[in-house]
Amino acid sequence: MFKYLLSALLLTTASAHADVIHQERSLYRNILVEESGDLRCLKFDEKARKSSQSCMFKSNPQKLVFNYTKLTFASLLMIDNPQNVLIIGLGGGTLSNVIHELYPTANIENIEIDPAVIKVARDYFYFKENEKVSSKVQDGRIFVKRAALKKQQYDWIILDAFNGDYIPEHLLTKEFFEEVKSVLAPNGIVAANTFSSSKLYEHESATYHAVFGDFINVVTEKNSNRIILAGFDTMPTTQSIAARVKKLRPLLSPYDVDIEALSRGMSSTENNQDWPKDTKVLTDQYSPANLLNLNSG
């Protein structure tokens, strides 16, 4: 718990005494890069509030700052040696950089609708691109539709296009999840960064369940995010997860990822659904995601 409190304190303190080192208005938002001591953060200035999208420690860029980013690596308890990775939503490129270091032979495609975000990630957050790592300016749903037409498949699909102020509603519908499922390789997994404390929770859960069946929530205390892990065929055994924890612990510890704690934060929805059976599924015709998220409770 102390780690989570310390992270929150660092971010709060940094925000209060930050220097703006870059500012621009893109086609989609106001973009800021702020520095406070050792911490550098990418922020979107929206609705009279700054929301942090990505942060790094300048002295140790590989050490992850945000808890939700760390939660994403619970995926590795479900899949082994991913070789084709799709990330929708770039931020500062943190996830891409870490995955590339862990799996240097993997092909990683980063899809980001805002070209200014990609440039900021390159210029200020050491986002790495090479023959294995690419970025593309495109709407995430359009990319997935075209990937499906090309019969492309991915072992690990990470949906990270949401923030606390705005949700692209077309990326949170049954139809979109069906499109995502169509490009998911056998034995692959979808990891979605989402919320655990708003009225959207039940609708989102019902929608994932309608497409993928039972899924796993990864939540740790003192954290307002959850990671949904979906698309797997069978739940790993306790023994299998323990073996993966042992294997992954030394690989992930340099990034400040406590994989054992993440394994304890996993809970399956099998015989454990925490939303009403009559919860309305989000569709292209019905997706008031931002209104539901605003009315948190």
Language-model regions, residue ranges each:
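Short, glycine/acidic-rich beta->alpha junctions
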Residues: 25, 91, 199-200
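N-terminal signal peptide c-region/cleavage motif recognized by signal peptidases
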Residues: 13-15
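Sec-dependent signal peptide recognition
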Residues: 1-8
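Soluble small-group transferase modules, centered on the S-adenosyl donor enzyme superfamily
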Residues: 19-41, 45-47, 214-297
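Rossmann-like AdoMet
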Residues: 18-70, 74-78, 101
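C-terminal substrate-binding/active-site "lid" region of AdoMet-derived donor-dependent transferases
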Residues: 177-240
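Intrinsically disordered, low-complexity coil segments
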Residues: 47-55, 145-152, 271-273
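The AdoMet/dcAdoMet-binding core of the Class I SAM-like
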Residues: 35, 63-189, 223
